[in-house]
Swiss-Prot record:
Residues reported in the UniProt entry to bind Fe cation 2: 31, 40
Official protein name in the record: 2-amino-5-formylamino-6-ribosylaminopyrimidin-4(3H)-one 5'-monophosphate deformylase
Function according to Swiss-Prot or TrEMBL: Catalyzes the hydrolysis of the formamide of 2-amino-5-formylamino-6-ribosylamino-4(3H)-pyrimidinone 5'-monophosphate (FAPy) to form 2,5-diamino-6-ribosylamino-4(3H)-pyrimidinone 5'-phosphate (APy).
Gene: arfB
NCBIfam families (UniProt xref): ArfB_arch_rifla
Residues annotated to bind Fe cation 1: 29, 40, 109
Pathway: Cofactor biosynthesis; coenzyme F420 biosynthesis; Cofactor biosynthesis; riboflavin biosynthesis
Molecular function terms, GO-annotated: 2-amino-5-formylamino-6-(5-phosphoribosylamino)pyrimidin-4(3H)-one formate-lyase activity; ferrous iron binding
Co-factor note (free text): Requires one Fe(2+) ion for activity.
Length: 230
């Protein structure tokens, strides 16, 4: 078997090859008329891939399924148990074939946040050290709102002819999660996002989109650097 040159290329620390970065988004959910149904997946994959390029960590691709609360019916999702099982299987496969020991999961879909409660068990069943990065979720704002629109502009996946229709909330109830009354009652953050979209509308700002991406990418790179320290 050939001896691998772990120091080859633009690599600051050869131990980074033991670290993987994987996106966790959602491929099948509505985001209003201006955004594709796999917006979350593409945003998460971009962040994970760019962080991989900058740090040298292994890019592991993206998890296929996603979870969502029952009271938010805006796409096709799986149960939390099924998502957990898929993540375990995916990470075990990466560990087997790529010899990784640590992973940063880049979450770009708010519905996946409950998976954080299962991280201890996922680590136990994969024997991996895992960091769950939620930076983009905490900064992008409402579902289908200005943050996602602006990042979509950066990626070139926005339908600009439909931006004016993005806030037709009677037709596109998923924008800001406006039409999901039970979810709004249960979560003050969802209620705040829905009101923001209703009262202030949405806008597209490519500079803002780049700033959001930079914040998220830098956060993931920082997590990778933390994993290098132990």
């Amino acid at each position: 078997m050939a001896e691998l040159r772990y120091r080859a290329g633009k690599i600051k620390n050869p131990r980074v090859h033991k670290i993987g970065v994987i996106a966790l988004g959602s491929h099948l959910e509505n985001h209003g008329p201006a955004l594709p149904i796999d917006t979350d997946a593409k945003i998460g994959a971009h962040i994970a891939f760019q962080a991989s390029l900058e740090s040298g960590a292994k890019f592991l691709g993206i998890v296929f399924p996603a979870y969502e609360l029952d009271e938010i019916d805006h796409g096709v999702h799986v149960s939390l148990d099924e998502l957990k099982a898929n993540v375990i299987s995916t990470l075990n496969s990466a560990k087997k074939y790529l010899d990784i020991e640590k992973v940063v999961i880049v979450n770009s879909h708010g519905g996946n946040i409950p998976l954080m409660t299962e991280l201890y068990d996922i680590e136990d069943k994969t024997d991996l050290t895992i960091i769950f990065n939620n930076k983009i979720i905490s900064t992008e704002g409402p579902h289908g709102g200005s943050g996602e629109l602006s990042m979509a502009k950066v990626l070139g996946i926005i339908n600009e002819a439909e931006i004016e229709n993005q806030t037709d909330l009677s037709k596109y109830e998923e924008v800001g999660l406006y039409g999901f009354k039970q979810a709004r009652e249960n979560d003050p953050n969802i209620e705040e996002g829905a009101r923001d979209v209703e009262e202030n509308g949405v806008y597209v700002d490519e500079v803002y989109g780049k700033q959001l991406f930079d914040l998220a990418i830098n956060s993931v790179v920082f997590d990778i650097e933390k994993l290098l320290d132990f």
